Amino acid sequence: MAALLCLWLVAALAQADEGAGFQPLPVDDPVNGGTMPGFVFYPLVEPSRIVWRGPYEVHATPGARVTDGSKPLVVVSHGHGGSALGHHDLAVSLAHHGFIVATIEHPLDNFHDLSGTGTAKVLVGRPIQVKATIDALLADAHWNAKIDPGRIGVVGFSAGGYTALMVAGAVPRFSRFLDYCELQPHDAEICSALAKAKLRGSEGTELAALQADLRKWGNPADSRVKAAFVMAPLSLLFDKAGLSSIHAPLFLSYAENDDVLVPKYNALSVAPFLKTLTGINRIPKAGHYVFLSPCSPQLAASAPAICTDPPEVDRVSVHERINADALTFFNQALRIPGQVQDH
């Protein structure tokens, strides 16, 4: 017993001394041209520093050298109007445990540019951009030597959850916008653009054009992705048939009081049809934005809508659970049996 306790203490101390590094990750955008900004997080053998990137307090050391060995890769897709650092605590947590994590900023659908909302460049382009990020890392000699191409996963929140489902093989049916907006016409987040199209008498034509564009930039699905961790997804566009082609294990997390993407029409509507679903977590009393990293005082002051939770919801504690769920899920879904793992 004493020997086992000693080994546990050594392992715990070793883990405490490990840190995370990160550096910019520019990726060519195959949808719009130009470059997508992003970051890559990775494990270090020394403790992390705390640095500021805009309003984000990131617990990772910029530019530090990644540890040796082949590691699993996870790509993170942010929500509508989000940021490449919107889930930095999850990226750091996974990096602490031996993962390489890439976070990208989706063009035309981020905090400083929403001009692509509702267009094919966003609704079809998002999964293509995730695939391009994987391509870029595997084509880079430095990162290729650090990544195990057989252990790749994806994380997505909100519109990023929609993105992750598509990368995992789901096929949306855009006419479901009409069905949903007939039931919930006052949902400004989802239905405002459709209402404008309806006034022009063109909503059916526009949705049909979106459907026709599903493979405009290639197949949105990526067979290299072996696991998808999905948070509060925009999933009302998927029916049973569209979900039947998902090839990867899934974990689904949603907020009980989400009034942006109501669970009844999104997370809970798809859960019964996810044949590869391995786990589901309901966050009691929380709203949609609880999945974003806990906010710094600066971010809370400038963006209270995405930083404010009900009094009974502690976002820091919620994220301890989210990060633990993600780690457990990816460890089970991506680890190759019998292979010696880093960390």
Describe these PLM feature segments.
Residues Q15-V76, H96, G279:
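Domain-level recognition of soluble alpha/beta enzyme cores
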Residues S48, H59-K71, V76-D113, D259-P263:
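Short substrate-entry loop that stabilizes the transition state in hydrolases
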Residues G81, L85-H88, V92, E105-I128, ...:
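Cap/lid segment of the alpha/beta-hydrolase catalytic domain
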Residues T119-A145, M166, S175-L199, L214, ...:
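Alpha/beta-hydrolase active-site loop
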Residues L236-L237, N257-L261, H288-Y289:
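Acidic catalytic loop of the alpha/beta-hydrolase fold
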Residues I246, L252-Y254:
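Short beta-strand/loop motif that positions the catalytic acidic residue
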Residues A248, V262-P272, C295:
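Short alpha-helix in the alpha/beta-hydrolase fold that links the catalytic acid
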